[in-house]
UniProtKB/Swiss-Prot annotation:
GO terms for cellular component: cytosol. It is an enzyme of class 2 (transferase). Its EC number is 2.1.1.228. This is tRNA (guanine-N(1)-)-methyltransferase. It comes from Alcanivorax borkumensis (strain ATCC 700651 / DSM 11573 / NCIMB 13689 / SK2). NCBIfam families: PRK00026.1 (NF000648), trmD (TIGR00088). One of its GO terms (molecular function) is tRNA (guanine(37)-N1)-methyltransferase activity.
Length: 265
């Protein structure tokens, strides 16, 4: 059933509005748009230029390579975005921003809406950031051609946390980094057939014992994180492992062939 007002509105300020179709045209986010739970609009800064070339960039003061996006068209584009999304926080996608984490996505999902500014070229005039942007967010320590892909990643991560978007609320809570799995990688998942080649589904998952399954999944999540992302495990330790979690992690490590070379201390 369509709602009369979207529960979450996102306005993407971009030179390439067609890229938003990756969100509005496919999968979970498309269903959220179709169901009125998510609204994604675009604003193109070129529509706010005053020359016949629709210029949005210029050479940097002080010299150097590349071009810098101009203040005026971006400021006008953001002002137009605020008309449609007045309570939204303005976020600039940038390698200089704070890392996008599950905790950050959860916090953003509680906002009334978002205005996302996707830069291009060498970046945007710093005066625009000082005057118009509330926060900068990065999706990783690497450089992309523009901010559109990071913006789409952010929209997808936040959309999953909007109530009702996923078919089952536990789907979001059992993702990596969420709920019981905060600061942990996800556990392994299996579906039919029960046997593929010489590989069988772990018997515990066929047992029907929900408590044993829960403990197995938590144990696997702890173990995977210990093996693949020890930095995340340290973050989990910082908030305190429960007695059960420490026991399950110790069991997992003891089961590994090379466990004597590693320690949980």
């Amino acid at each position: 059933m369509m709602t009369t007002k979207p529960t979450f509105a996102v306005t993407l300020v971009t030179l390439f509005p067609e890229m938003a179709q990756a969100i509005t045209g496919f999968g979970v986010t498309r269903r959220a748009v179709d169901n009125g739970q998510l609204q994604v609009e675009t604003v193109n800064p070129r529509d706010f230029t005053e020359d016949r070339h629709r210029t949005v960039d210029d050479r940097p003061f002080g010299g150097g390579p590349g071009m810098v996006m101009k203040v005026e068209p971006l400021a006008k584009a953001l002002q137009a975005a605020r008309v449609a999304n007045p309570a939204a926080k303005v976020i600039y996608l940038s390698p200089q921003g704070q890392p996008l984490t599950q905790a950050k996505a959860t916090a953003l999902a509680e906002q009334p809406g978002l205005i996302l500014l996707a830069g291009r070229y060498e970046g945007v005039d710093e005066r625009l950031l000082d005057a118009e942007v509330d926060e900068q967010i990065s999706i990783g320590d690497y450089v992309l051609s523009g901010g559109e892909l990071p913006a789409l990643v952010l929209i997808d991560a936040v959309s999953r946390l909007i109530p009702g978007v996923l078919g089952h609320q536990d789907s979001a809570e059992q993702d990596s980094f969420s709920g019981e799995f905060e600061n942990l990688l996800d556990c392994p998942h299996y579906t039919r057939p029960e046997v593929y080649g010489e590989q069988a589904v772990p018997p515990v998952l066929l047992s029907g014992n929900h408590e044993l399954i829960r403990r197995w999944r938590l144990k696997q999540a702890l173990g995977r994180t210990w093996q693949q992302r020890p930095d995340l495990l340290e973050a989990r330790r910082a908030r305190g492992l429960s007695k059960e979690e420490q026991q399950l992690l110790d069991e997992y490590i003891a089961e590994q062939p090379s466990h004597t070379a590693k320690t949980t201390d």
